[in-house]
Amino acid sequence: MNLRPLHDRVIVKRIESETTTASGIVIPDNAAEKPDQGEVLAVGPGKKNDKGELIALNVKVGDRVLFGKYSGQTVKVNGDELLVMKEDDLFAVVEK
């Protein structure tokens, strides 16, 4: 199954954080916080302004983005846990 986001929504896959600290302590899954970074997998066409003109999104497929820990709606697709969220829920694009 493929998802095609509508309007100003994006599909994001969380990027898992390290499960071992710098000192070598292993953090169990249930104690680890949800990561707040992800990779954009798909973007919608954008949203319309007051004049009816389509405004494209600022993010693109492949961008690494920052978002709130509880942002978006979680969906499972082909065994992967993905997030569907509005572009407004994104805080920043991580530049390489």
From Swiss-Prot:
Family stated for the protein in its record: Belongs to the GroES chaperonin family.
Main location: cytoplasm
InterPro entries: Chaperonin_GroES, Chaperonin_GroES_sf, Chaprnonin_Cpn10_CS, GroES-like_sf
A GO MF term: protein folding chaperone
Role summary: Together with the chaperonin GroEL, plays an essential role in assisting protein folding. The GroEL-GroES system forms a nano-cage that allows encapsulation of the non-native substrate proteins and provides a physical environment optimized to promote and accelerate protein folding. GroES binds to the apical surface of the GroEL ring, thereby capping the opening of the GroEL channel.
Cited CDD domains: cpn10
Name by which UniProt lists this protein: Co-chaperonin GroES
Annotated organism of origin: Acidovorax ebreus (strain TPSY) (Diaphorobacter sp. (strain TPSY))
Keywords (A to Z) from UniProt: Chaperone, Cytoplasm
Location in the cell: Cytoplasm
Record text on subunit structure and interactions: Heptamer of 7 subunits arranged in a ring. Interacts with the chaperonin GroEL.
GO biological process: chaperone cofactor-dependent protein refolding
Gene Ontology CC: cytoplasm
HAMAP family associated with the record: CH10 (MF_00580)
Superkingdom of this protein's organism: Bacteria
